[in-house]
């Protein structure tokens, strides 16, 4: 899952040994190579460095420290570094085997989490979509005028507010994300779970989906029973908020944070821009911007240097490493 601290000076995680380790020329050369190969290739290259004869103990330690990239913050990775400090080749081999198991377990756990969230997302999407379609049909069937004439004024009001509700939610999300979710202590109490590593398929921040769904339910219920243009407009606004929430879940949770697979849509140019724009939000590099979701790239265009960085990160984006 792509989570980064709120405060940070870079959009990408730091790659390098701890500051107290001296960076020798050999270690620096090795680290530069690591940035251009996959995690699996990193591990193979580093394992060769560790077991290669005539390599100084310090280089072995640096190599083992770099292995923490593959399984950060795990007991196995910490044990690997401790084994390197002992300078024992056998201990290093054992630690590498432990790291292999840690990587396999981590991948299996992530797969289970993705399947759990995907099942919940599919069930919610099908259920909400079915209810919305059926409720729309019932509303206009109930309020048709005598003789069966279609109330075109109400239909137009509903369609306009569907679009308006969705666009309005993007503006509201930009405001709420900054003022409520980050700057408000109560909002941050839930939202901070989204900016820290997650250990399960769900996080406290997911409660905002329910909270933001309440206005949509109220508007749809009120507009469903009110037989005039105002009722049609309220019904449409509720549908627009619902549509925005479903799209937000697909793009934010699925595409950006990889909580479930999204298929080939991830390769679309604008979807890549949405991804790296939200990545910059998690980095905190531009004061937390962008705060919006679907217009995040446009929000960054007003910040000096941000638009150029978005284009650079789009070119560097590699889904196989995420």
UniProtKB/Swiss-Prot annotation:
Coiled coil: none annotated. The chain crosses the membrane at residues 118-138, 149-169, 207-227, 231-251. One of its GO terms (biological process) is xanthophyll biosynthetic process. Nonheme diiron monooxygenase involved in the biosynthesis of astaxanthin. Hydroxylates beta-ring of beta-carotene and catalyzes the conversion of canthaxanthin to astaxanthin. Uses ferredoxin as an electron donor. Pfam families: FA_hydroxylase. Its EC number is 1.14.15.24. Keywords: Carotenoid biosynthesis, Chloroplast, Hydrolase, Iron, Membrane, Metal-binding, NAD, Oxidoreductase, Plastid, Transit peptide, Transmembrane, Transmembrane helix. A motif (Histidine box-1) lies at residues 177-182. GO terms for molecular function: beta-carotene 3-hydroxylase activity; hydrolase activity; iron ion binding. It catalyses: all-trans-beta-carotene + 4 reduced [2Fe-2S]-[ferredoxin] + 2 O2 + 4 H(+) = all-trans-zeaxanthin + 4 oxidized [2Fe-2S]-[ferredoxin] + 2 H2O. GO terms for cellular component: chloroplast membrane. A motif (Histidine box-4) lies at residues 278-282. It is a multi-pass membrane protein. Induction: Up-regulated by moderate light in correlation with the redox state of the photosynthetic electron transport. The gene is CRTZ. Belongs to the sterol desaturase family. It comes from Haematococcus lacustris. It is an enzyme of class 1 (oxidoreductase). The histidine box domains may contain the active site and/or be involved in iron binding. A motif (Histidine box-3) lies at residues 252-257. Residues 164-286 form the Fatty acid hydroxylase domain. This is Beta-carotene 3-hydroxylase, chloroplastic. It is found in: Plastid, Chloroplast membrane.
């Amino acid at each position: 899952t792509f989570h980064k601290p709120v405060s940070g000076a870079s959009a990408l995680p730091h790659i390098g040994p701890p500051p107290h380790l001296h960076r020798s020329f050999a270690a620096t050369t090795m680290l530069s190579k690591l940035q251009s190969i996959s995690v699996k290739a990193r591990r193979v290259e580093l394992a060769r460095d560790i077991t290669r004869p005539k390599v100084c103990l310090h280089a072995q330690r640096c190599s083992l420290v770099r292995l923490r990239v593959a399984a950060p913050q795990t007991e196995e990775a910490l044990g690997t570094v401790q084994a390197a400090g002992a300078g024992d080749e056998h201990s290093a081999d054992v630690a590498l085997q432990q790291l292999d198991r840690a990587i396999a377990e981590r991948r299996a756990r992530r797969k289970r989490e993705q399947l759990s969230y995907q099942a919940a997302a599919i069930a919610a999407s099908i259920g909400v979509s079915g209810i919305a379609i059926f409720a729309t049909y019932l509303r206009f069937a109930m309020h048709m005028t005598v003789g069966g004439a279609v109330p075109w004024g109400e239909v137009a009001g509903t369609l306009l507010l569907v679009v308006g509700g969705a666009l309005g939610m993007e503006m509201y999300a930009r405001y709420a994300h900054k003022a409520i979710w980050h700057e408000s202590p109560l909002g941050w109490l839930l939202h901070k779970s989204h900016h820290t590593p997650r250990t399960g398929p769900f996080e406290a921040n997911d409660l905002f989906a329910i909270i933001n769904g309440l206005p949509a339910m109220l508007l749809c219920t009120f507009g469903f029973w009110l037989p005039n243009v105002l009722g049609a407009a309220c019904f449409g606004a509720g549908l627009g908020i619902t549509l925005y929430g479903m799209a937000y879940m697909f793009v934010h949770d699925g595409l950006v944070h990889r909580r479930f697979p999204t298929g080939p849509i991830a390769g679309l140019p604008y979807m890549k821009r949405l991804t790296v724009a939200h990545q910059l939000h998690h980095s905190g590099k531009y004061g937390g911007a962008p705060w919006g979701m679907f217009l995040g790239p446009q929000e960054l265009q007003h910040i000096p240097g941000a638009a150029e960085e978005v284009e650079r990160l789009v070119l560097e984006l590699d889904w196989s490493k995420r």
